[in-house]
Amino acid sequence: MVKAISSNLGYPRLGEKREWKRALEKFWNGAISEEELLAETKALRLHALKKQQDKGIDLIPVGDFSFYDQVLDTSVTFGIIPKRFQHDGGKVSLNTYFDIARGKSDAVASEMTKWFNTNYHYIVPELAEADPKVLDNRALYYYEEAKNELGIEGKPVLVGPVTYLKLGKGSDAESFEILLDKFIPAYIEILKELETAGATWVQIDEPYLATSFDKKEIALFEKVYKAFHDAVPNLKIELQTYFESLDYYEEVVNLPVAAVGIDFVHDHGDSIKALKAHGFPQNKYLAAGVIDGRNVWRSDLDAKLALLTDIAHYVAEDKLIVQPSNSLLHVPVTKLSEPDLDEVILGGLSFADQKLDEIAILTKALTEGAESVAAELNEAREAVKALNESSHRNNLEVQAAIANLENVRVDRELPFAERIKLQHEWLKLPLFPTTTIGSFPQSPEVRKTRADWLKGNITDAEYNAFIEKETARWIKIQEDLDIDVLVHGEFERTDMVEYFGQKLAGFQATKFGWVQSYGSRAVRPPLIYGDVAFTEEITVKESVYAQSLTKRPVKGMLTAPVTIINWSFVRDDVPESVVANQVGLALRKEVEALERNGIKVIQVDEPALREGLPLKQARWQKYLDDAVYSFKLTTASVQNDTQIHTHMCYSDFDDIIDTISALDADVISIETSRSHGEIISTFEEVTYDKEIGLGVYDIHSPRVPTVSEIQDNIRRALRAIDAKQFWINPDCGLKTRKEPETIAALQDMIKATKEVRAEYQVLEK
């Protein structure tokens, strides 16, 4: 027997039915007061803590809650507030907090980017002239709240100082250690206040440790955690890593902390190898992340128990902690909200609450013996077996098509330089052609009509008539704005991935499988539970209708395989590359159907390509090769005069520019406005031979850009990109924006474009 401890690393903020999102948006819209927002979110927070307590979790995280983002929380804790928000130096108000994330009329929002290789976004700290001081010990507040309200001796959670600073901008390698030295005393102040309040454990997240970095940077962690240990020697610090294995395992496990949290799920088997090769300090706790915190499939508890038993051989008898691989922020709350799912699929699922059950079962099995949870282990065993052996996962036609891939063409017939001439001949677009990325605002009326249709309150005919009316209205708006290449607006779609999941075999949508993407923005990733196959035309009807309304080209709009993979919960019984190729083959048929029906500009979005990169650079090439292959599998069969577009979201592109080119899309649009200078510098250093649009304004903020701001962005881009290659577009889709601000921003974009276009035409003469 092993005396094990159960733990959690973080819990979803959204609520079972997105109550958190609704509370935030009511506050932003002025429908509730700050006091009402605080009361609503406190009730959600305590409910989540009580559930974890009732499930028998020993170490319950507190302070993982946020009103927007945990990295932004760290910034406001230490007073790292950009000057443009005119902070007065005291505790940061909730309005200022939201302004940093969302922007306001006279101050643009802080940059937002992906949290490691997930679809969660964090607000990037602006570290120039940073002078950290503890303005608000949020961790202390949440610790005392849990203790006083529920009697929970919680485990406060902090973003570690090295990771926080590495995620920021405005400091270089030379100033990094100087900046770190400023933050260490501020963190110590937080830790001392927690210790004084009675905290026993503190979880400090340092996922940067799971990335690829120079070994000399280990000295940064040694400095930080020695200082922490010297200041609060009796406080048990759990140094938490996740999303990958540790390149410097020996150095990390010997840092002066009470516990080290290691990911045994997303580590490619490296963590157990390192443990066996180097052992583990007997005076430390090993917090073993064995339950997948990023996916929704039920664990093979027999295999997990065997792994934990193996791990236990290398850890002191009372120092094994059982936990998820990472915070459960990345999965929905509970599968109990999905009673209508197929029984076999439902049985194979495990959302946040069920993962806590799995942790409790494994902890009890270690402590009291497997026989004490024999029924639970058998139930899990049968559920996993039923799903794996079901017809859902054994489509022989799809498997035969995958086996025949070597006979499928994945290259366009003509190279770009030749086919672009054919495209220009019929498109006849002006210099700096304008377009949008795909979606237009989904008004309350759009959402209500869709909800009524789903509930059966209106007929299919009534719903389709409404979608056509809205599409026609926005085609007219685009023509009036004088946009060159139009889109149909995607009013029939709830989400750019979920919509395709509803039409392809092997996918299953959920009702309440929501996860946070950024701020109050929630997404509902489909479940890819089985073999993926094309069953019906997905986008043709809406695209053809939109094209019938205008002489201007209308883009067909699809989502590419890797983004569908990265924004779905993907089956874990086959390699993701196999699933991506199944999706690619299915979408290839949709692309061909669009072309066959007269749609000659087809956008296949790959916004999540960069975010899915493995954290270890040694694994990059295979991932990128697989991504290029599945994209070309989707697009290569079109005629030479059909123009393929693609779109990518927030990313650092300098290290994958060759991959972007290898996709062989005729036009790429990139979301860049919050980090415009960095993206432009990439194109100053490389020669990109295809056509490209760099987003000229930020759509994640309700703020309407000025014409001069857009022109500045255009002119900066044209320093690095040939005018004949350059397209002009917003950063991203406009679904989440309101109609007045959308039209106003597009008017400014078109005005800015025409003025710059005129300047260039004069120069050409």
Swiss-Prot record:
<feature type="binding site">
    <location>
        <begin position="437"/>
        <end position="439"/>
    </location>
    <ligand>
        <name>L-methionine</name>
    </ligand>
</feature>
<keyword id="KW-0489">Methyltransferase</keyword>
<feature type="binding site">
    <location>
        <position position="605"/>
    </location>
    <ligand>
        <name>L-homocysteine</name>
    </ligand>
</feature>
<dbReference type="InterPro" id="IPR038071">
    <property type="entry name" value="UROD/MetE-like_sf"/>
</dbReference>
<dbReference type="GO" id="GO:0003871">
    <property type="term" value="F:5-methyltetrahydropteroyltriglutamate-homocysteine S-methyltransferase activity"/>
</dbReference>
<keyword id="KW-0479">Metal-binding</keyword>
<dbReference type="InterPro" id="IPR002629">
    <property type="entry name" value="Met_Synth_C/arc"/>
</dbReference>
<feature type="binding site">
    <location>
        <position position="647"/>
    </location>
    <ligand>
        <name>Zn(2+)</name>
    </ligand>
</feature>
<keyword id="KW-0862">Zinc</keyword>
<feature type="binding site">
    <location>
        <position position="114"/>
    </location>
    <ligand>
        <name>5-methyltetrahydropteroyltri-L-glutamate</name>
    </ligand>
</feature>
<keyword id="KW-0677">Repeat</keyword>
<feature type="binding site">
    <location>
        <position position="605"/>
    </location>
    <ligand>
        <name>L-methionine</name>
    </ligand>
</feature>
<comment type="function">
    <text>Catalyzes the transfer of a methyl group from 5-methyltetrahydrofolate to homocysteine resulting in methionine formation.</text>
</comment>
<keyword id="KW-0808">Transferase</keyword>
<dbReference type="GO" id="GO:0032259">
    <property type="term" value="P:methylation"/>
</dbReference>
<feature type="binding site">
    <location>
        <position position="671"/>
    </location>
    <ligand>
        <name>Zn(2+)</name>
    </ligand>
</feature>
<dbReference type="Pfam" id="PF08267">
    <property type="entry name" value="Meth_synt_1"/>
</dbReference>
<feature type="binding site">
    <location>
        <position position="732"/>
    </location>
    <ligand>
        <name>Zn(2+)</name>
    </ligand>
</feature>
<dbReference type="GO" id="GO:0008270">
    <property type="term" value="F:zinc ion binding"/>
</dbReference>
<keyword id="KW-0486">Methionine biosynthesis</keyword>
<dbReference type="Pfam" id="PF01717">
    <property type="entry name" value="Meth_synt_2"/>
</dbReference>
<keyword id="KW-0028">Amino-acid biosynthesis</keyword>
<feature type="binding site">
    <location>
        <position position="649"/>
    </location>
    <ligand>
        <name>Zn(2+)</name>
    </ligand>
</feature>
<feature type="binding site">
    <location>
        <begin position="18"/>
        <end position="21"/>
    </location>
    <ligand>
        <name>5-methyltetrahydropteroyltri-L-glutamate</name>
    </ligand>
</feature>
<feature type="binding site">
    <location>
        <position position="567"/>
    </location>
    <ligand>
        <name>5-methyltetrahydropteroyltri-L-glutamate</name>
    </ligand>
</feature>
<dbReference type="InterPro" id="IPR006276">
    <property type="entry name" value="Cobalamin-indep_Met_synthase"/>
</dbReference>
<feature type="active site" description="Proton donor">
    <location>
        <position position="700"/>
    </location>
</feature>
<comment type="pathway">
    <text>Amino-acid biosynthesis; L-methionine biosynthesis via de novo pathway; L-methionine from L-homocysteine (MetE route): step 1/1.</text>
</comment>
<comment type="similarity">
    <text>Belongs to the vitamin-B12 independent methionine synthase family.</text>
</comment>
<feature type="binding site">
    <location>
        <position position="490"/>
    </location>
    <ligand>
        <name>L-methionine</name>
    </ligand>
</feature>
<feature type="binding site">
    <location>
        <position position="490"/>
    </location>
    <ligand>
        <name>L-homocysteine</name>
    </ligand>
</feature>
<feature type="binding site">
    <location>
        <position position="611"/>
    </location>
    <ligand>
        <name>5-methyltetrahydropteroyltri-L-glutamate</name>
    </ligand>
</feature>
<dbReference type="InterPro" id="IPR013215">
    <property type="entry name" value="Cbl-indep_Met_Synth_N"/>
</dbReference>
<dbReference type="GO" id="GO:0009086">
    <property type="term" value="P:methionine biosynthetic process"/>
</dbReference>
<feature type="binding site">
    <location>
        <begin position="437"/>
        <end position="439"/>
    </location>
    <ligand>
        <name>L-homocysteine</name>
    </ligand>
</feature>
<protein>
    <recommendedName>
        <fullName>5-methyltetrahydropteroyltriglutamate--homocysteine methyltransferase</fullName>
        <ecNumber>2.1.1.14</ecNumber>
    </recommendedName>
</protein>
